[in-house]
């Protein structure tokens, strides 16, 4: 309904109160299944769901000039997926295959702003930087929600 009304709709993780996982692939797969379970004839396509989890999500956040799609001048935020897993379904549509069967465990490589942070099971990050960033995020969160622990 929101899409038909022309509203910006993005998908993201971060609300485990509604779904108890932080896996965008699972979020998109659940959306596909809900649409079909409701027998919605106009269910959202896999292509639309992928866009909702990437460019549309960036638009909702107002950061589409930096992320959300691969374009010159934007951050190179990329993941590479291993489609060889036994749980991967065979389909002619790679986007549908991605959304219907991939999970975080299929991610072979993660690149953020052009830097490879994770590749083939190995993290390429400085633990001191990670701890510093976690502290920064927690202090921002605490400033925004001082009554929360």
Regions found by a protein language model. Name each.
Residues 2-85, 101-102:
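His/Asp/Glu-enriched, well-ordered alpha-helical/loop segment
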Residues 51-149:
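Active-site microenvironment of metallo-dependent hydrolases
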């Amino acid at each position: 309904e929101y899409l038909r009304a022309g509203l910006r709709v993005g998908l993201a993780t971060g609300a485990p109160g509604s779904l108890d996982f932080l896996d965008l692939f699972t979020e998109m797969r659940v959306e596909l299944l809900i649409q079909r379970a409701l027998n919605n004839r106009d269910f959202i396509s896999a292509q639309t769901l992928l866009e909702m989890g990437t460019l549309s999500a960036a638009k909702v956040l107002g950061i589409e000039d930096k992320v959300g799609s691969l374009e010159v001048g934007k951050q190179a935020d990329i993941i590479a997926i291993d489609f060889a897993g036994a749980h991967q379904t065979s389909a002619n549509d790679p986007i549908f295959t991605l959304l219907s069967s991939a999970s975080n465990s299929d991610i072979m490589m993660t690149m953020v702003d052009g830097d490879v942070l994770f590749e083939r099971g190995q993290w390429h990050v400085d633990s001191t930087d990670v701890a510093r960033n976690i502290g920064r995020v927690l202090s921002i969160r605490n400033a925004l929600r001082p009554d929360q622990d």
